[in-house]
């Protein structure tokens, strides 16, 4: 078990982290997600031991790494670190990068390096290559192998996939998650990419202004965000004002079931795109009627602007487009799920 307990950090008069508490179980994967300047990288640096908190405690396996009386240096923490773009030593070969820090004979070190290359699916023929001679994805695997060589109990990943192209980023992320799980190494990923966080982690911590706004499973923070800002940060969301009563919200898109039967009065609600079904209207349609005013077609997802004959308001939303809808097309709007009701 790794724990942060009431950890705070200031730089000058700026409160960068404020009373952060987080628990990680062995072999688990946690993503810390938030906008630039929210404190993500500073938090990783405190965990790694590159910086020290002003207050609070950091423990691993019940032993203090930082407390008012203890401060374990970074090289003694058994924590691996993979920074952005790998940060390989340019003057060392792939083999030398991975073997850096392994205290063993030359023969034993080479044996361990080969085993690590196999573990991260790197061709052994790359061992004598220089970092600039291999691809970005291969460089990240070298950085991961180098970190794993220290047999860490915890792995820190500071936006390590951000420099990769979209397809390579997804495959490298999946391979990294699988590898860490197989090795039983707990991992903390820092990212500003919500999709990356949701797909990588078993626990999401949303950080904002140096505080955790919400911590929970990816499913919980996505479908039950604590507030509007968290909802919009984690993905496309339709935020509406509604009159809530008896388990339903009356709003611009009609009467929508809500996730809190106790909620009453004027409230703000959230709908994700998934339960919104938009189809060309047919004769005798009983669903809510609207007209496409504008469409920004982007393949799988499109941005639609809808107008309603009996309402002055318009509605703009991102949604799956089953077929190309042209401006002027009458459509039917159906809600197949529940809306999230935010606290009053």
Residue ranges and their predicted role:
Residues 54-57, 209:
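Conserved coupling/switch loops of ABC nucleotide-binding domains, chiefly the family-specific signature
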Residues 56-67:
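Conserved ABC transporter NBD signature motif
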Residues 78-80, 93-229:
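ABC ATPase nucleotide-binding domains
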